[in-house]
């Protein structure tokens, strides 16, 4: 292999080409590759961060859901207790009202009973007076007074 001027020219041209490439082409190409590598690394880091945030959000949502269920259970239990209290209060009020009505009815019955006794007493007095006057008027005849007394007893 002979080294001649053409080969030396090609070597010089190639060296200039390599120098030009290293000076002007390689830095932007290397910069583009570095930016691409950084973007990929940033994208992976972002995806990893998003994955962790998603996991945290899932845990938080599960905790919030658990708290909401506990609160709902508590609300239902409180509502049940309140309803039971209202039911008991209504029963107590109904019993009190029934007792009051019963007491009033008993009092009214007692008043009617006293009134009826008074009327009966008054009627008995009137009948006794009538019988006594008939007995006095008919005291001469024993049969007549016996009949008057029997009539009186039948009326009573």
Curated annotation (Swiss-Prot):
Q: Where in the cell is it found?
A: Cell inner membrane
Classify the source by domain of life: Bacteria
This protein's GO CC annotations: plasma membrane; proton-transporting ATP synthase complex
TM segments? 5-27
Q: How does it sit in the membrane?
A: Single-pass membrane protein
Offer an example of a GO molecular function term for this protein: proton-transporting ATPase activity, rotational mechanism
The principal localisation class reads membrane
What role is this protein assigned?
F(1)F(0) ATP synthase produces ATP from ADP in the presence of a proton or sodium gradient. F-type ATPases consist of two structural domains, F(1) containing the extramembraneous catalytic core and F(0) containing the membrane proton channel, linked together by a central stalk and a peripheral stalk. During catalysis, ATP synthesis in the catalytic domain of F(1) is coupled via a rotary mechanism of the central stalk subunits to proton translocation.
* Stated family: Belongs to the ATPase B chain family.
On subunit structure and binding partners, the annotation says: F-type ATPases have 2 components, F(1) - the catalytic core - and F(0) - the membrane proton channel. F(1) has five subunits: alpha(3), beta(3), gamma(1), delta(1), epsilon(1). F(0) has three main subunits: a(1), b(2) and c(10-14). The alpha and beta chains form an alternating ring which encloses part of the gamma chain. F(1) is attached to F(0) by a central stalk formed by the gamma and epsilon chains, while a peripheral stalk is formed by the delta and b chains.
Protein name per its UniProtKB record = ATP synthase subunit b
Q: Which organism is it from?
A: Francisella tularensis subsp. holarctica (strain LVS)
Its gene?
atpF
């Amino acid at each position: 292999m002979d080294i001649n001027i053409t080969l030396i020219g090609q070597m010089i041209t190639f060296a200039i080409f390599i120098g030009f490439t290293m000076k002007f082409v390689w830095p932007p190409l290397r910069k583009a590759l570095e930016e691409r590598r950084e973007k990929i690394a940033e994208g992976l880091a972002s995806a990893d961060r998003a994955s962790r945030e998603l996991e945290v959000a899932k845990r938080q949502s599960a905790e919030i859901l658990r708290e909401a269920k506990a609160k709902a259970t508590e609300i239902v239990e409180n509502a049940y207790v309140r309803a039971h209290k209202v039911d008991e209060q209504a029963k107590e009020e109904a019993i009190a009202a029934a007792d009051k009505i019963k007491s009033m009815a008993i009092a009214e019955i007692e008043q009617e009973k006293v009134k009826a006794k008074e009327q009966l007493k008054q009627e008995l007095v009137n009948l006794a007076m009538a019988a006594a006057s008939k007995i006095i008027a008919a005291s001469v005849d024993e049969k007549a007074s016996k009949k008057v007394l029997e009539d009186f007893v039948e009326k009573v």
